[in-house]
Amino acid sequence: MAITQESKQIQVLRFIHEAQSENGYPPTVREIGEAVGLSSSSTIHGHIERLVKKGYLLKDASKPRARAIEVTDIGLEMLGISTTPGKIPVLGMVTAGTPILAVEEEATEFFPIPDNLMQFDGDLFMLNVHGDSMVNIGILDGDKVIVRKQENADNGDVVVAMNDNNEATVKRFFREADHYRLQPENNSMAPIILQKVSILGKVIGLYRDAIY
């Protein structure tokens, strides 16, 4: 019985961590119950209190909802999640201009993951930007973009996309009636129209070595 009880507590802990990573705030008691198969709110509260006592959760009702319950480093270790800061591999160059063959398979260097992106550890890569087609949104020649790996994109997302010739570019993505439009953020540049496109990832961050 003790093993079953511990297992259910870990399920609660894991769901709290996953929901908070995905949404930016912890789940409700009802959501926890639905996820782990518990209908009694008092039972769920009991699991949470025991997780707090074990040091796996930190609960502070005085904080905003986003930080009212947090999984501690000890709790993350219990879930098998490393608390050592991860690194983002830099995989070459991407153009903010005419597409070029750019993305390499092996990292040329590594950057520490910012705290606000730690939940995406393992799903991130960086590319050096060459060109000025995205200047309207502040992506400049020489910047590094942080990209979350994903194969799909919503209209308006800034993505790293690859055409049939394995040429990569960073542009704003639009799926239209019979083609895909990769839109520059530079008023002097025309969009790229493609019949087929592969999405390598969505741009979610930016790093700049120096401010001029």
Swiss-Prot record:
Annotated keywords: Autocatalytic cleavage, DNA damage, DNA repair, DNA replication, DNA-binding, Hydrolase, Repressor, SOS response, Transcription, Transcription regulation
Gene: lexA
Summary of subunit composition and partner proteins: Homodimer.
A Pfam family it matches: Peptidase_S24
NCBIfam families reported in the protein's UniProt record: lexA
Database matches in InterPro entries: LexA, LexA-like, LexA/Signal_pep-like_sf, LexA_DNA-bd_dom, LexA_repressor, Peptidase_S24_LexA, Peptidase_S24_S26A/B/C, WH-like_DNA-bd_sf
UniProt GO molecular function: DNA binding; serine-type endopeptidase activity
Reactions mediated catalytically: Hydrolysis of Ala-|-Gly bond in repressor LexA
Function: Represses a number of genes involved in the response to DNA damage (SOS response), including recA and lexA. In the presence of single-stranded DNA, RecA interacts with LexA causing an autocatalytic cleavage which disrupts the DNA-binding part of LexA, leading to derepression of the SOS regulon and eventually DNA repair.
UniProt site (Cleavage): 96-97
Protein name in the entry: LexA repressor
Ranges annotated as spanning the membrane: none
EC number(s) from the headed UniProt entry: 3.4.21.88
Active-site residues (renumbered): 133 (for autocatalytic cleavage activity), 171 (for autocatalytic cleavage activity)
DNA-binding region range list: 29-49
